[in-house]
């Protein structure tokens, strides 16, 4: 069990990380650069 907002933030970060890893690598600038 943990603080709800902490868990929500942690899960959101995990989802964003998975989303970023699913995108092709790019050396560009802007939202597509990770």
From Swiss-Prot:
The keyword Transmembrane does not apply. One of its GO terms (molecular function) is hormone activity. GO terms for cellular component: extracellular region. The modification Phenylalanine amide is found at residue 34. Disulfide bonds join 2-7. Keywords: Amidation, Disulfide bond. It comes from the Eukaryota. This is Calcitonin-like peptide 2.
């Amino acid at each position: 069990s943990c603080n709800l907002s902490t868990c929500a933030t942690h899960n959101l970060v995990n989802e964003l990380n998975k989303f970023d890893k699913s995108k092709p690598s790019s050396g560009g600038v802007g939202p597509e650069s990770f």
